Amino acid sequence: MGTASRAGIASARRIVVKVGSSSISGDNAGQIAPLVDAIASVHARGAEVVLVSSGAIATGMPFLRLDDRPADLATQQAAAAVGQSVLIFRYQESLDRYGIVAGQVLLTAGDLAAPDHRENAQRAMERLLGLRLLPIVNENDTVATHEIRFGDNDRLAALVARLVDADLLLLLSDVDALYTRPPEEPGARRIEHVGFGDELDGVEIGSTGTGVGTGGAVTKVAAARLAAEAGTGVLLTSTAQVHSALAGEHVGTWFAPRG
C-alpha cells in the first residue's frame, strides 16, 4: 500500500528517489553529497531506497570537451559511456561516509516491457534491497536509441516505482513545485496538492536553460500520474529541498495515489 498523504512520507518504508541531470552535474555536482545525506538518513531509519539518477551524458560532456549536449546519438552514447562510470564513482565516494554500498542497474524501456526481462529486473532489485544496498538506476544510454531522450528518466522512475511497489516516488529537479503559470511571473501560485484523476491544464515547472536534461512539466506530470495510478504517492520538488521532502514537510506538489 502506497503512502496515501504527505503525513505518511516520514514513515514510508520503500522509496524511489529520482534526480535529474541539471541537479547533479556541471556546477551542481556538489549537490550529490547533500542528496546522499538525505538518502542515508532514511536508510538509517530502516527504509529501503532506490535512486534513479540521470546525468550520465551531462557528466561525460566535459571529458569529451563538449560545452553543449550533443545532438547526434553516437556522441550522446559516447558521453554516456564515460559519464556513467564517473557518476557512479561520485555517488559511491559520498556513500562511503555512511558505509552504504551502491549497486548499478542500467535499464532500457524494453527491459521493463518484456515480462521475462521485467521479472529479472524485479528479482535483482528485490535482492539488492534485501541486502540493504542502494540500487542506482539509470537508462542504459550507451545502447538506447529513442529512449535516450525518454523524459529525462521521469517515466523510468515511475516504472521502477511500480516494479518495486514503492510507497513513495520523490521526483527531484531544480525547481520546487508545479505552478499555475511560469513561477517568475506575477500571480503564479504553487500547486500544493493534485487529487487522483484531477485535471491539470497549463501548469508550469519553470525553466532552467541548462541544456543538459530532457525532462519538463509534461514528463513529470505524466510520470507522477503513472505511479499514482499504481497506488504510489508522488512528491515533486527541488533537489535542494530533499531533506524537507523526505521529512514530510509541506514542500513541493503532492500527487495523491489511487485508492
From Swiss-Prot:
Annotated compartments: Cytoplasm
SUPFAM superfamilies membership: Carbamate kinase-like
Residues binding ATP, per UniProt: 18, 173-174
Chief localization: cytoplasm
InterPro entries: AceGlu_kinase-like_sf, Asp/Glu/Uridylate_kinase, Glu/AcGlu_kinase, Glu_5kinase, Glu_5kinase/COase_Synthase
A Pfam family recorded for this sequence: AA_kinase
One GO MF term: ATP binding
The reaction(s) this protein catalyses: L-glutamate + ATP = L-glutamyl 5-phosphate + ADP
Alphabetical keyword list: Amino-acid biosynthesis, ATP-binding, Cytoplasm, Kinase, Nucleotide-binding, Proline biosynthesis, Transferase
Entry's Gene Ontology BP terms: L-proline biosynthetic process
Family: Belongs to the glutamate 5-kinase family.
Official protein name in the record: Glutamate 5-kinase
